[in-house]
Amino acid sequence: MGRSAELRRALVVEDEIMVAMYVEDLLTDLGYEVAGMATALDEALCLARDGEFDFAVLDINLAGQLSFPIADELRRRGIPFLFASGYGSKVRSDAHAEAVRIQKPFIGRELARAIARIA
């Protein structure tokens, strides 16, 4: 599955560095560029406000803090995003109930399908 013409550069927000590196590798293998990576809420919010990227992959739980404020900022900027979570539907936000979610662990094919849904 090829990358979308509109979505080329990704922001990855993930607090577990090994998982972040795995997601970065998957995105690279799928033909995307990782334009930014954040492991903490404050860092991710700065990137969400000022970063230059086309879409984002957000872990929901960042060391006990929820990533919904990041999603709010991305929505405000009109940047598509998807949530990646190992918690299934246990952690929810009414404001983002319709957001695309991918269940961890996932493989490249599943990530590609999720990205296609936000394109």
Regions found by a protein language model. Name each.
Residues 84-85:
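Hydrophobic/aromatic residues positioned on beta-strands within the core alpha/beta folds
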Residues 37-55:
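Acidic, metal-coordinating helix/loop segments flanking the phosphotransfer/catalytic sites
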Residues 59:
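Active-site residues of response regulator receiver
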Residues 17-36:
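Two-component/phosphorelay signaling modules centered on CheY-like receiver
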Residues 1-9, 93, 107-119:
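Non-catalytic signal-transmission and effector/linker regions of two-component phosphorelay proteins
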Residues 104:
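A Lys-centered signature of the CheY-like receiver
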Residues 14:
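Conserved acidic carboxylate
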Residues 66-69:
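Acidic catalytic/metal-coordinating carboxylates
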